[in-house]
Structures are given as structure tokens and as C-alpha cells.
């Protein structure tokens, strides 16, 4: 006599027996009917039970496919748990990018490459995800790669997407969740990707290579772009439309940075083959300041944060005011800079130098758009020049502490510059040079601060601000090169 299963209930056992007979019925031929009848008897199934509707068609096959789907779901969930566990470890482990020492705020890579990710083509741009342990890079062949820092195998990307038909020149993430990704290309398009990295929008309008893109710091639905067609464009990515376009330079626009003002809206800093950088007010399209002094193409520009950098440079200028006779002494303490949200910027050029500028504040008139600065003929003041690279300086990044400037060059090196040198020696020199790439350095990225847990509008002191930065800082730094590789530096 057949023993009843100890795992299944009586009803489940009965359903299974019926499903077995149901599955075998169309398989068994006339000659095997005797075997089928004997099996039906052994399983204690009446023939009338199989004629009714108490068991669905193809019951056994459907159960089997359900089990397979559940097994796949379990594997996916186990992988997700593994990734989330690694993310937690990444947040709490020094070896995964977080330094627990008291000097974390001044962390820079020691110079050894922790991981190398190899692509099939020149790496043109790189970005770290704002929140997840993911590295993104765009290549000259139009491919977008996504690498997971927690994976043991660094030879296989998490994902590879044929994003564009020509080179991906730059990419950027929005500043708030959900984190949108924007990529721009020599195929004249900009593409928008959602938080799961699905393509959701293509922006058309530029008439030549799109060089760089940047999300508005104040609105994740607004994107800015610059192009070889000399135009600066403002996009609404939710609608996929261009809201504004204005000519920023007389030649190819190479790069841009954006900052949000408390009362005046956004400002963008752009640079060009015309050897200049320009500050523009987005809402009006008016150019309010120019930065002239480079002797070759200006490849990259960055605003400096209001912490540390401002204090160090202010102190240097104040102590050496005789070197800057055209800077009004009262200007450095003018509260207009607090309202604007910017004061200093840096630019990098093919003349092998980086220049530090004091930005002349635009003229503010109530109920009107900002006008060109009344100071210094709207020209930025050159405060310092960083010399040390032996070839074109292609890319810039600003350390979260605000006082380190990071540069990548065609001389295959990455340099870290300390603004403290202005106070100590009157000049800015490289405190660290790292090398390891075998080709030009095309892009670099220092991990963005994690989202703030505080919702307070309280004005922080410099010390409180630095403590908050240190708490939210991720010690991750990457570079992308013409040698087809991305390096994560430890």
C-alpha cells in the first residue's frame, strides 16, 4: 500500500495525484491504458474525478513553471540582499572608501589603484552614482557602461548599453531623488535615463557636438547643455522641450558648471575654444562676467564651494591687497556673495595651466534680471595660476572640503592642489600626483556627498558645515582614460 506524503496535506496529495494522471493521459497510447488504469487505481483516483473541473488544465506544467519563477525570484532577492549588505559594508568599511580617521575631511587617494575596469574603447567620461556603489562611464563608441563596486569580478560590467551612435562626451546625475542620468554625445543628442537606467527621453536641438551637460541644482527637471554650435540650452526633461537657447561664446563651448542663487535663480559658468570662460544668468541669458587670460582652449570650469576655499582665498587677497589694486577692499566682505552662492571659480586649459578667479558680482536691481558687473569691466580677477602639468589640462573636480582642486591632464597624471599654499607660500602647488593610466586622462570624479539627514534651515558655522561634510563624505575617486580604462583610487 502506498504511504501518504508527510510533507503535503491530504488535499494537496490528492491534487498532485490528479495532476500526475492528467499529465500522463495524453502521453499514454491505447497499449498503455492498462498501465494508466493501474496507476490511477494506486493513486486512488476515480475516473469521474478527472472529468470534472476541480483541477485546472495543464496543472502540473503550470505548477512546475511557477516553481521555476519563484526560484528565480529567490535568487534575485538573495543577490539584492548581497548587494545591499555590501553597500552597508561600503558605508562602514575603510577598505570600501570610507575613512574613519579624524582627518577624513582631508582624504585624498594614496596613489595606488584599487580597481581597474577595462572597456573596449576610449573612455571619454566617468561618474560615480550619487548614492549607490556604481561607476558609470561613456566611451567613444557610444557605449554606456555600469560597474558595481561590490562585485568580486571587475571584468564584467553590471550593464552595458548602446546609448548613442557616436562618442558619449559627458554625463551627469540630478541632485535629488529619483536620480536621473543625462548623457550627451557627438551624435547631437542628449539622452535621459531613469533611476533604473532605462532610456526615457531624447533631447534634440543642438546643431553640432553636444560637449557637456549639467542638471540645475534647484530643479531636477531642468538640464543645461553646451555645444560646438556655440549655444547654451535650457531643457525641461519632463516635457522633452528646449525652454531657452542663447549664444554664450564665439567658438565651441566645451564645458559648464551650475550654481543656484537664493534670490536670482541659477547661474552657469561656461568655457570655450575662444580661450575664455563666461558667467551667465540662466533666466535672462545675460552674460554678467568674463574670464580672460588663458592662451589656449579652456577645457573645464568649476565653481568653488563657499566653505574653506572662500576663507583661504579671502585671507590671501587681504594680506596681499597691494598685488590686486583693482579689487575694492570692501568687496571681499560684501554680503552679495552669500546671496549669490558663488565667489570664486577655477578654469583648466590646453595652455597646461589652471587659473583661480575672483568672480565680479553682477549688478542686482530689484524686479529686474541681473546685469553685467559694475566692477573691473565685468572681468574676473586672476588670483593665482597653478602650474605643474606638462600637457593639456582636460578636467577638474573639487574636493568636498573645498580647499583641494583636482585636475586630470594629457600628461597622464592626476594632481591634487591645496589652496592652503596661498597662505603658506603665496602660491598653489600640487601636494599629490598620481599616475597609473597609460593614456590621456579624459575625466575624473570625486564622489558626491550623501543626502543630508537634517531638514533644518539653520545657518551653519564653517566648523559645523565641515563636520556635516565629513559625516556625509564618501572617500571614492575615479578617473577615465584614453587607455580604455577606469580606475578607482584608494
Swiss-Prot record:
GO biological process: cell division; establishment of mitotic spindle orientation; microtubule sliding
Assigned GO CC terms: cytoplasm; microtubule; microtubule associated complex; spindle pole
Keywords, in A-Z order: Cell cycle, Cell division, Coiled coil, Cytoplasm, Cytoskeleton, Microtubule, Mitosis, Repeat, Transport, WD repeat
Transmembrane segments: none
Signal peptide positions on this chain: none
Residue windows of the WD repeats: 118-157, 163-204, 205-245, 251-290, 293-327, 328-367, 388-427, 436-487
SMART domains reported in the protein's UniProt record: WD40 (SM00320)
Keyword Methyltransferase among record annotations: no
The protein's role, per its UniProt record: Positively regulates the activity of the minus-end directed microtubule motor protein dynein. Plays a central role in positioning the mitotic spindle at the bud neck during cell division. Targets cytoplasmic dynein to microtubule plus ends, thereby promoting dynein-mediated microtubule sliding along the bud cortex and consequently the movement of the mitotic spindle to the bud neck.
Subunit details: Self-associates. Interacts with NDL1 and dynein.
Protein name: Nuclear distribution protein PAC1
Species this chain originates from: Candida tropicalis (strain ATCC MYA-3404 / T1)
